[in-house]
Amino acid sequence: HRDLHSFPTRRSSDLDQVDGHGNVRHFSKIVCMHEEDYGILWKHTDVGADHSEIRRSRRLVVSSFFTIGNYDYGLFWYLYLDGTIEFEAKLTGTLYLRAIHEGEETQYGALVAPGVNGMIHEHYFNIRLDMSVDGDDNTVVEVEAKRIPTGPENPYGNAHTPVETIINSEIDAARDIAPQNGRFWKIINRSRTNTLGWHAGYKLMPGPNIKPMHQPDSPFMRRAGFVNHDLWVTAYDPDQLHAPGQYVSQNEGGPGLPEWILENRPLVDTDVVLWHTIGVLHLPRPEDFPVMPVEYVGFTLKPVGFFERNPTLDLA
């Protein structure tokens, strides 16, 4: 096993964690909270009136850093003035290294210093999002753009339209990103409607991602089957807290998202949980040695129909 270590920060809250032996450890000043400037919130220039308006953006940052083995992981949540919520993982620390003879093949790694081979590897995060958008009765909708064939309705060949598909049950809810179609997922409350007719909602906008490089019969894939899909949706269950099941490092596979969705519970107008998988393939480079600059991955939650207009218009 590998124990998880956290280190104090300023302006922070305490946290209890379970170590590799199952004991509760109390850490002081672990979860950091601060506000920071974030450039431009919105801007427009009215050319005819020769007038510009601009507002500064600020965000509340809730963060913590953890050390697991040779890696250091920062988990950052950003809360923006317009209702946007962003998650960002910061990956740093040191590479997993092995000694290498001069001229030896580096097939499974990369030469990062004389006699030092940095091993190729992957990282996976699964973020459990217990959504309650204006209440617990939520529905997940997959949205992507569809191109319209050139013809009478599209004479210039530049038209496209959104296509929405309700995710009705758990087996249908193992989904993957499709950046070529701008795919995202809305979580809406169909009993809450604004004056424009929009259901109150938030949309999950994925960032860059990868598919697992492991073979399907590998021990890793048996234990971590959740990496097979970028998004899973399940009905809320208080006992389902971790995507690979309760004891990922001590089992030979089985419990976890691939098994849970076989219940095929309905997902429309109910309490839903989204599980977003994020993967990073790390091909080491000399610049990663001896300590790695931060690599960033994450996703964004944006309000869609939750407000009736830009909620930051009253900022001075």
Describe each region flagged by the PLM.
Residues R2, S6, R10-T84, K90, ...:
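Extended effector regions of multi-domain proteins
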